[in-house]
């Protein structure tokens, strides 16, 4: 893989992680392709969810690989109660080994989300983020100074494009229970559909955000506090912001950046809006003051 796009203070750790992913992606694909990969275990993770077999197998594989990196001090999986910590290193990795696992049996797109933090697990310390999506093809997206998209072919990641969101998109991925949506959100969604937006929600956050990014605009929303800050929300918020979009939530009717949120507990959850500029403006218009 050509690493010419990666520059600055955190470039080396990102390159090391990508190198691990490039070497391990075939193994990860093998785990996902096993006939019983989507079968539920009898366990319960720290978030109260029941993981599938592929969740646990990928988690073990990724943890071992991330801990092998010399400059990584701590590794923290969504499946675990607390991080695994080493004596040395500067970086902390928080990851969701298999986002979208609940729809994997339907053969929908799933992926691994990775947040690279410096010194502490805080949004303000997020140095970079990455995700790999597994479908009929495998792709890697990296957020550092900008957002870079790669396709996996002949055992290597090949550069496809630098992703920059346009001002206005054409798709929306609106998750959650609609009966619980606020009146403002319902009006905003009605307005989007009146403008001929297309609904593209799959139940896999990484897949839906990937769709918004590669289509160069749109909106992903999950108004209920269900998504985990460290493992899903912050890494994908950074991805959207670096692509010139907005990542936000509403606090008593006031729009605020997701990446300025505090973290009171490791598995704390948040509402989440990820959008290009036009959609962000519309959402603020209707949800402001609610």
Curated annotation (Swiss-Prot):
Location relative to the cell: Cytoplasm
Residues that bind substrate: 99-102, 201, 226
Entries under Pfam families matching the protein: FBPase, FBPase_C
Superkingdom of the organism of origin: Bacteria
UniProt-annotated binding residues for Mg(2+) 1: 78, 96, 98
Comment on bound cofactor: Binds 2 magnesium ions per subunit.
EC number: 3.1.3.11
Binding site for Mg(2+) 2: 96, 99, 232
Record-level GO cellular component terms: cytosol
Record pathway: Carbohydrate biosynthesis; gluconeogenesis
Co-factor requirement: Mg(2+)
Keyword line: Carbohydrate metabolism, Cytoplasm, Hydrolase, Magnesium, Metal-binding
GO biological process: fructose 1,6-bisphosphate metabolic process; fructose 6-phosphate metabolic process; fructose metabolic process; gluconeogenesis; sucrose biosynthetic process
UniProt-recorded Gene Ontology molecular function terms: fructose 1,6-bisphosphate 1-phosphatase activity; magnesium ion binding
Reactions performed catalytically: beta-D-fructose 1,6-bisphosphate + H2O = beta-D-fructose 6-phosphate + phosphate
Protein family according to the UniProt entry: Belongs to the FBPase class 1 family.
Assembly mode: Homotetramer.
PANTHER family the record matches: FRUCTOSE-1,6-BISPHOSPHATASE-RELATED, SEDOHEPTULOSE-1,7-BISPHOSPHATASE, CHLOROPLASTIC
Listed name of the protein: Fructose-1,6-bisphosphatase class 1
Species for this entry: Helicobacter pylori (strain Shi470)
